């Protein structure tokens, strides 16, 4: 295919504005889905002995196994029903499950109703993660029709920013909710925290109102469900613009009927997609292995409390690291490596190898550890945005984008589940196992990323 055919298209200002209005609210919905997913980690610290590390690892592990395998159904389903319906299902379902988890804590803490927290949370979080699994496939499915292959590296960076913003919501906003709803406030509250405290009537509370960690994202997601129902469009033609050839793996097949067997065969026999899926399994281990367990390690082993910078602003650090990693990865992919994704993933995995090895030697040196986990977050979120957010569109094409991201994001959460159960078990025995567990996955991911260094999507046939 000639360079002229693959040249970046020139869009009108009106199209770019409408595309922004399409992906930005959907991106915020996706970010708040993260808040409704990882608030479990913040609740674990807030609940103390009510949720042990083993319980947390099991609940999170059950949810992530569900998330991983739900993609096998929800990816092809989203290719059939479209991304808009998928994101609406995701937002409404996740909001409802968070509402149920909040009600469970309310009954348990405020009214002393005897409930088995492990069983109830495992079931609710399982269903939460099932609905959550529609989110990533929806955002990639919709944007596959709005972004040309030469624009997708930058979109992969944007995807990384959205993930990072979601982590900021999940950790910092959830921590802010914890501070605002404590019976005995031990730190100065900012304007928003004080406002929330008065709004929900926590000023004169006699117990910590931890259930608001789940109520707040539920309310936000219900609002975005209504917003997206009116704003989001699956294709440019639904918003008054002409559809265009994005020159991905579905190029020239726009009018062909969706055939599940054909699309599954295409995805499962694509060497690059399978390798990307395995790389992303390693990404899942490394991303959650740092993101969740550092937060717990810092409190348990380093004695950092809610007022300490890294605990109070862990989400902000993840957002800055992830956003910069995502945008740099997108820039390098499109501008330096000719819209190839493998070289960027290999570069970032090389950084992760170095950091995880050093981490094993400076585990209890707070400042050095903070720098290392931030750099790993920079690298892992950049990799995830580039592979799950961009390579899936490239090699799956518009017709199979959701199925491709389903397989690949499913692999991410298979890795997440592996680390959740494994590190929950290992860290109960010795925290030194934490970085040692991560090192092999960083090496394996690097080797696989190098193997797809030259991979680039090919259109099925010339488009008209």
Labelled PLM ranges:
Residues 159-236:
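Helix-loop-helix hairpin linking two adjacent transmembrane segments in secondary transporters
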Residues 58-76, 316-329:
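Central cavity-lining transmembrane alpha-helices of secondary-active solute carriers
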Residues 124-163:
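Cytoplasmic helix-loop-helix junction between adjacent transmembrane helices
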Residues 80-92, 334-349:
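Cytoplasmic membrane-interface "Motif A"-like loop-to-helix N-cap segments
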Residues 339-387:
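C-terminal transmembrane helical hairpin of 12-TM major facilitator-type secondary transporters
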């Amino acid at each position: 295919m000639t360079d002229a055919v693959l040249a970046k298209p020139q869009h009108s200002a009106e199209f770019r504005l409408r595309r922004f209005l399409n992906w930005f609210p959907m991106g915020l919905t996706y970010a708040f889905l993260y808040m409704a997913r990882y608030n479990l980690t913040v609740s674990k610290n807030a609940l103390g002995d009510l949720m042990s590390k083993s319980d947390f690892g099991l609940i999170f592990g059950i949810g992530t196994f569900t998330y991983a395998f739900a993609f096998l159904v929800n990816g092809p389903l989203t290719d059939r029903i479209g991304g808009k319906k998928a994101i609406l299902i995701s937002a409404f379902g996740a909001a409802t499950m968070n509402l149920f988890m909040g009600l469970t804590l309310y009954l348990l803490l405020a009214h002393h109703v005897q409930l088995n927290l492990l069983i109830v949370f495992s079931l609710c979080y399982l269903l939460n993660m099932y609905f959550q699994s529609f989110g990533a496939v929806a955002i990639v499915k919709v944007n596959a029709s709005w972004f040309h292959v030469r624009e997708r590296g930058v979109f992969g960076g944007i995807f990384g920013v959205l993930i990072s913003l979601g982590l900021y919501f999940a950790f910092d906003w959830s921590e802010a909710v914890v501070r605002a709803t404590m019976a005995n406030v031990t730190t100065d509250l900012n304007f928003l925290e004080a406002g929330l405290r008065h709004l929900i009537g926590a000023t004169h509370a006699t117990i910590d109102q931890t259930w608001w960690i789940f109520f707040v994202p539920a309310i936000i997601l219900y609002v975005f469900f209504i917003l997206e129902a009116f704003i989001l469009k699956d294709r440019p033609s639904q918003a008054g613009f002409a559809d265009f050839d994005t020159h991905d793996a579905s190029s020239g097949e726009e009018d062909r009927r969706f055939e599940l067997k054909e699309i599954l065969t295409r995805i499962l026999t694509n060497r690059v997609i399978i390798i990307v899926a395995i790389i992303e399994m390693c990404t899942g281990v490394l991303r959650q292995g740092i993101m969740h367990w550092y937060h717990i390690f810092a409190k348990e082993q380093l004695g950092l409390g809610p007022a300490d910078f890294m605990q109070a602003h862990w989400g902000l650090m993840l957002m800055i690291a992830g956003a910069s990693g995502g945008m740099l990865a997108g820039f390098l992919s499109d501008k330096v490596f000719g819209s190839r994704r493998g070289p960027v993933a290999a570069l970032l995995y090389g950084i992760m190898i170095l950091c995880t090895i050093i981490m094993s030697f400076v585990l209890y040196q707070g400042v050095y550890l903070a720098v290392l986990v931030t750099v790993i977050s920079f690298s892992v979120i950049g990799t995830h945005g580039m592979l799950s957010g961009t390579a899936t569109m490239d090699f799956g094409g518009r017709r199979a984008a959701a199925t491709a991201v389903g397989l690949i994001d499913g692999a991410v959460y298979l890795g997440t589940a592996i680390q959740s159960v494994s590190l929950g078990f290992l860290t109960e025995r010795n925290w030194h196992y934490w970085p040692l567990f991560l090192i092999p996955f960083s090496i394996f991911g690097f080797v696989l990323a190098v193997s797809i260094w030259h991979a680039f999507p090919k259109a099925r046939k010339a488009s008209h």
